[in-house]
C-alpha cells in the first residue's frame, strides 16, 4: 500500500509505504509546540481516518508556510542519517511542490 502527501486538489507527492512512514515520522518530529495545531490538521486523515495520506489542502498561506519550514527542518535533520540518500529525491519533490504552491505567493520561483 502506498501513500501520498496532498498539497492541493491538483498537486500531490505519491510515495511508497516506506517513504510515507519515513517522511511522516521525520516531519512530525520537527513541529514546534506552538505549531501542533498544524500537525493535527495536516495529519488528520492519517491519525483519525486511518488513511495513508496527509494533506495541506485546508491550510492558509500562514499555515502552509509553517508546514514548509517544518519540512525544511526535518529534511536538514535527516541529512545526518545514513539512509538519507535513499530519500533525498522524495524530499526534493516535496519541497519543490510546496514552494510552488500559490498560497505562498512564490508560484513559479
UniProtKB/Swiss-Prot annotation:
It comes from the Bacteria. CDD domains: CdiI_BpE479-like. Disulfide bonds: none annotated. Immunity protein component of a toxin-immunity protein module, which functions as a cellular contact-dependent growth inhibition (CDI) system. CDI modules allow bacteria to communicate with and inhibit the growth of closely related neighboring bacteria in a contact-dependent fashion. Neutralizes the toxic activity of cognate toxin CdiA (C-terminal 160 residue CT fragment) upon expression in E.coli. Does not inhibit toxic activity of CdiA from other strains of B.pseudomallei. Specifically interacts with cognate toxin CdiA, which inhibits the toxin. This is Immunity protein CdiI. The gene is cdiI.
Amino acid at each position: 500500500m502506498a501513500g501520498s502527501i496532498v498539497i492541493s486538489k491538483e498537486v500531490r507527492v505519491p510515495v511508497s509505504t516506506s517513504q510515507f512512514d519515513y517522511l511522516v515520522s521525520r516531519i512530525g518530529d520537527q513541529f514546534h509546540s506552538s505549531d501542533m495545531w498544524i500537525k493535527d490538521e495536516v495529519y488528520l486523515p492519517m491519525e483519525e481516518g486511518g488513511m495513508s495520506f496527509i494533506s495541506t489542502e485546508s491550510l492558509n498561506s500562514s499555515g502552509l508556510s509553517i508546514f514548509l519550514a517544518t519540512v525544511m527542518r526535518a529534511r536538514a535533520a535527516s541529512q545526518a542519517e545514513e539512509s538519507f540518500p535513499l530519500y533525498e529525491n522524495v524530499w526534493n519533490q516535496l519541497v519543490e511542490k510546496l514552494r510552488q504552491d500559490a498560497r505562498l505567493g512564490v508560484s513559479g520561483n
